[in-house]
């Protein structure tokens, strides 16, 4: 596997999105995003020391710092259910938000704006939550948003829940599996209607 510039940035910030730490997302993200004019990023699921502290030298907001460095002109937003995940830094702003609460999701979009270029769902990883969040937030975001759901174990279940959307599972190497060697670290790209 080729180590991309984004892989190196991800490793530097200790996010689990890079192959050297956990997932093989950053090589795919690099190819997908390297030529895109990304100005606004919103990631749901920031991570806390309780959930990510097993990664040596982990810092809260690791992936937000990765996006901030990779997109030097972008405003980066993060949202999480835990108050322990809140950080503020240059071009990074975080908000409390429960991905299963429609009103909180609407308030989040009111705060960050609907003109998000890249949205990543890295929150609870529960299929029902992933479907609910996509169905709730996609109509509030601009049509050409790049919407990615991470840590997908059963993409067919999510696709059924999002039947009105065009969903695509890109081919990436896998490092984590459910029983019967079914990958549980897939990505799902959802195209807004």
Regions of interest found by a model, annotated:
Residues 1-149, 153-193:
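A short alpha-helical cap/connector motif
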């Amino acid at each position: 596997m080729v180590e991309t510039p984004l892989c190196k940035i991800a490793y530097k910030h200790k996010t689990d999105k890079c192959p050297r730490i956990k997932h093989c997302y950053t090589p795919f993200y690099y190819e997908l995003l390297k030529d895109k004019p990304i100005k606004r990023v919103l990631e749901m699921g920031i991570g806390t020391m309780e959930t990510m502290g097993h990664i040596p030298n982990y810092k809260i907001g690791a992936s937000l710092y990765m996006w901030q460095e990779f997109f030097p002109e972008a405003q980066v937003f993060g949202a999480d259910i835990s108050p322990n995940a809140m950080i503020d830094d240059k071009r990074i702003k975080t908000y409390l938000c429960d991905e299963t609460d429609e009103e909180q999701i609407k308030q989040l979009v009111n705060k960050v704006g609907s003109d998000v270029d890249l949205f990543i769902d890295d929150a609870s990883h529960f299929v029902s939550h992933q479907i609910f969040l996509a169905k709730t937030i996609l109509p509030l975001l601009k049509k050409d948003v790049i919407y990615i759901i991470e840590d997908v174990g059963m993409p067919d279940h999510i696709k059924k829940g999002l039947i009105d959307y065009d969903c695509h599972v890109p081919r990436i190497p896998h490092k984590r599996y459910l029983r019967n060697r079914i990958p549980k670290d897939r990505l799902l790209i959802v195209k807004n209607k």
